[in-house]
Curated annotation (Swiss-Prot):
Gene Ontology biological process terms, A to Z: photosynthesis
Protein's name according to its UniProt entry: Allophycocyanin alpha-B chain
UniProt PTM: Contains one covalently linked bilin chromophore.
Keywords linked to the UniProt accession: Antenna complex, Bile pigment, Chromophore, Electron transport, Membrane, Methylation, Photosynthesis, Phycobilisome, Thylakoid, Transport
InterPro entries: Globin-like_sf, Phycobilisome_asu/bsu, Phycobilisome_asu/bsu_sf
Gene that this sequence comes from: apcD
Organism: Microchaete diplosiphon
GO cellular component: phycobilisome; plasma membrane-derived thylakoid membrane
Length: 161
């Protein structure tokens, strides 16, 4: 939940106006809006490049994934894996824009371990995939922007671990 939503809900629960401290936290959040939007735009505009690089890194590190018997063996399985890369990158942009991990949790992480386990997808492999996605994405960002985006990737990695 964004800072703005949190402040409004808290104040409303207590039937009061937001305090000056709460208003300052909203102001600080708003001041980071340009940066958060820039990061999300960069990730969205470079999705194809990021996904291609992450895929390349993952296959180089784990060729067993695309070898016969691997979970990404064959064109269909590989396409599904690449699709998931794009989906997770989109989740990251939602978190960055909101300045909060809640969209990632609500939209993407509830039940993800169970889903992958039921499909026979090794969760440790997904963790490696997200780590590759993180590296490919952060390599396109400035150090400051990478520091802002990194925790959202880490949140997904930790949730899957």
């Amino acid at each position: 939940m964004t800072v703005i939503s949190q402040v409004i809900l808290q104040a409303d629960d207590e039937l009061r106006y937001p305090s000056s401290g709460e208003l300052k936290s909203i102001q600080a959040f708003m001041q980071t809006g340009v940066k958060r939007t820039r990061i999300a735009s960069t990730l969205a505009e470079n999705e194809k490049k990021i996904v291609q690089e992450a895929t390349k890194q993952l296959w180089q590190k784990r060729p067993d994934f695309i070898s016969p018997g691997g979970n990404a063996y064959g064109e269909r399985q590989r396409s599904l894996c690449i699709r998931d890369f794009g989906w997770y990158l989109r989740l990251i942009t939602y978190g960055v824009l909101a300045g909060d991990k809640e969209p990632i949790e609500k939209i993407g992480l509830i039940g993800v371990r169970e889903m992958y386990n039921s499909l026979g997808v090794p969760v440790p492999g997904m963790v490696e995939a997200i780590a590759s996605l993180k590296k490919a994405a952060l390599d396109l960002l400035s150090a400051e922007d990478a520091a802002e985006a990194s925790p959202y990737f880490d949140y997904i990695i930790q949730a899957m671990s």
